[in-house]
Amino acid sequence: MKALTARQQQVYDLVRDHISQTGMPPTRAEIASQLGFRSPNAAEEHLKALARKGVIEIVSGASRGIRLLLEEEPEGLPLIGRVAAGEPLLAQEHIESHYQVDPMLFKPSADFLLRVNGMSMKDIGIMDGDLLAVHKTQDVHNGQVIVARIEDEVTVKRFKKVGSKIELHAENPEFSPIIVDLREQSFTVEGLAVGVIRNGEWL
């Protein structure tokens, strides 16, 4: 597929969204109106350009005769790898790749995958190298397994809040709890663990 110009991408997105919302393509007049073209003929010229680039087919003799040829693959869930200090967890530079996993397989639905580093949660089946499915939220409760950021370090632990302190418990007797004093340390909940994908068995 040849690259689309910014205006061609706008026209393509409008056609795609209109089909998704109404079940049918827009007319040339509707495209012109929504994108500020002077006339439906201008919309027609952009549609012809899209047809030449192979992303749509124009069906002659119909005002709504537009068929999409380019079916976009969903990106899937982003896989977060090593996280740089001071950067948001979902920053583009942290995303290693995307995996075609249905977010609705998890309850609540997953927003991203995090590669597990270490064996601190092995007793509940979260192993080194696993992909942890995470629902992005800051609304968590005692006893839940969460993804947290302490200062600039990201960790997966069982959450417990006691007064002004947070206790993050491992599921491995070899690891001591992490105690966070909210009055002195930076602490952020990045999300709730909602499932595990055993790395290597499904890829």
Swiss-Prot record:
The active site is at S120 (for autocatalytic cleavage activity), K157 (for autocatalytic cleavage activity). It catalyses: Hydrolysis of Ala-|-Gly bond in repressor LexA. Keywords: Autocatalytic cleavage, DNA damage, DNA repair, DNA replication, DNA-binding, Hydrolase, Repressor, SOS response, Transcription, Transcription regulation. InterPro entries: LexA (IPR006200), LexA-like (IPR039418), LexA/Signal_pep-like_sf (IPR036286), LexA_DNA-bd_dom (IPR006199), LexA_repressor (IPR050077), Peptidase_S24_LexA (IPR006197), Peptidase_S24_S26A/B/C (IPR015927), WH-like_DNA-bd_sf (IPR036388). Its EC number is 3.4.21.88. Pfam families: LexA_DNA_bind, Peptidase_S24. Residues 28-48 bind DNA. CDD domains: S24_LexA-like. The keyword Acyltransferase does not apply. GO terms for biological process: DNA repair; DNA replication; negative regulation of DNA-templated transcription; proteolysis; SOS response. The record marks A85, G86 as: Cleavage. GO terms for molecular function: DNA binding; serine-type endopeptidase activity. It is an enzyme of class 3 (hydrolase). It comes from the Bacteria. Homodimer. HAMAP family: LexA. Belongs to the peptidase S24 family. Represses a number of genes involved in the response to DNA damage (SOS response), including recA and lexA. Binds to the 16 bp palindromic sequence 5'-CTGTATATATATACAG-3'. In the presence of single-stranded DNA, RecA interacts with LexA causing an autocatalytic cleavage which disrupts the DNA-binding part of LexA, leading to derepression of the SOS regulon and eventually DNA repair. This is LexA repressor. The gene is lexA.
